[in-house]
């Protein structure tokens, strides 16, 4: 009866089902590569699974757990899935981390920069304005008059606390390029501390880590 229902002509015959619907069938036994190829059509992509997992975390505002999943999903799509990229950037914005969000938005193709992209860009600009504290402004003025490593460290700390990590790291790296042991190694230590606080999910981390390695090696 089953053989008649599924029109099985020979044994063995394999059927592939999804949600109680037969999607594919083939007689005899397939080799591993052929089976994987057929299954890839039916099974969800790894990037989609990670994206869905990230959505579950975002629903409960667990941004830290969602970030690496969104990063993996975006990279698995070869950074071509702009919907994933937008949510990745939006998550950073929700955490008030504008620089990695901007880094992601910059990589989205022009044809995909829709109203949502522009909305996120506007949110970034507002957060940057809010993060320009009087303390930062004063230290910037002090550093412009007297560009010492000591003032640079204080300014970098304030920038980091305001979520302006790229500015902080760029400032410190400019000093490290000329003197890797500046301020008895404190500049390098502060540079590494900021990188550590940013975490590996931040797209800026690897960028500045590579720059530091270029000086060390």
Swiss-Prot record:
Gene3D superfamilies this protein is in?
Tetratricopeptide repeat domain (1.25.40.10)
- Record's Pfam families? TPR_19 (PF14559), TPR_20 (PF14561)
Q: Which organism is it from?
A: Haemophilus influenzae (strain ATCC 51907 / DSM 11121 / KW20 / Rd)
Entry superkingdom: Bacteria
Protein's name in the database: Uncharacterized protein HI_1159
The family database entries (InterPro entries) matched by this protein are listed as:
TPR-like_helical_dom_sf (IPR011990)
């Amino acid at each position: 009866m089953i053989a008649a229902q599924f029109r099985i002509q020979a044994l063995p015959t394999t059927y592939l089902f999804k949600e109680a619907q037969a999607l594919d069938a083939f007689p005899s036994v397939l080799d591993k590569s052929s089976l994987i190829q057929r299954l890839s059509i039916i099974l969800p992509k790894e990037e989609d699974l990670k994206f869905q997992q990230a959505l579950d975390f975002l629903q409960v505002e667990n941004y830290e757990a969602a970030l690496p999943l969104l990063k993996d999903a975006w990279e698995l799509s070869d950074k071509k899935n702009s919907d994933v990229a937008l949510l990745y950037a939006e998550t950073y914005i929700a955490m008030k981390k504008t620089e990695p969000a901007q880094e992601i938005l910059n990589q989205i193709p022009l044809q995909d920069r829709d109203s949502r992209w522009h909305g996120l860009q506007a949110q970034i600009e507002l957060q940057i304005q809010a993060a320009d504290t009087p303390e930062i402004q004063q230290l910037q003025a002090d550093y412009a008059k007297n560009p010492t490593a000591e003032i640079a460290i204080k300014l970098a700390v304030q920038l980091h606390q305001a979520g302006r990590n790229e500015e902080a790291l760029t400032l410190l790296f400019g000093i490290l390029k000329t003197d890797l042991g500046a301020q008895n190694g404190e500049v390098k230590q502060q540079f590494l501390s900021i990188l550590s606080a940013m975490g590996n999910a931040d797209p800026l981390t690897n960028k500045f880590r590579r720059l530091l390695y270029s000086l060390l090696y």
